A protein has these predicted regions:
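Tandem repeat scaffolds
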Residues: 1-118
Length: 118
């Protein structure tokens, strides 16, 4: 099924849109709920293996999210907050940590104190 030049509200429920393609489509105020979008090039969404590139998520909120194994590169997180999160095994490399605080402590101060005592 091919649609071109549509300018209407669509409601799609309980459907399989496997291998669908959306190109040059404006989707302001679109909602995706209880949706599986594996390997896509948004409550209850499976986006495992999705790729996000040149995406603006400023002021976005993520709650009850599984980001295990995620790779984050060349990302701006300035003035953000990470709260009640498991950071076990996380590595932070080659990052600007100016003003970064963990539980109220400046990380740069902690690193300086560590280096002074080794």
């Amino acid at each position: 099924m091919e649609h071109t030049g549509l300018s209407e509200t669509m409601v799609v429920t309980d459907s399989v849109l496997e291998e669908s393609s959306f190109s040059g489509v404006a989707m302001p105020s679109v909602r995706f709920e209880d949706t599986r979008m594996r390997s896509a090039r948004i409550d209850h969404v499976d986006m495992a293996d999705a790729v996000f590139s040149r995406v603006k998520l400023a002021r976005a909120r993520f709650t009850i999210v599984d980001l295990s194994g995620v790779h984050i590169e060349n990302v701006m997180l300035a003035n953000g907050t990470i709260q009640d999160a498991s950071l076990a095994g996380v590595e932070i490399n080659d990052c600007d940590i100016e003003g970064l605080r963990i539980n109220g402590y400046l990380v740069s101060d902690l690193i300086a104190a560590y280096r002074k005592n080794i």
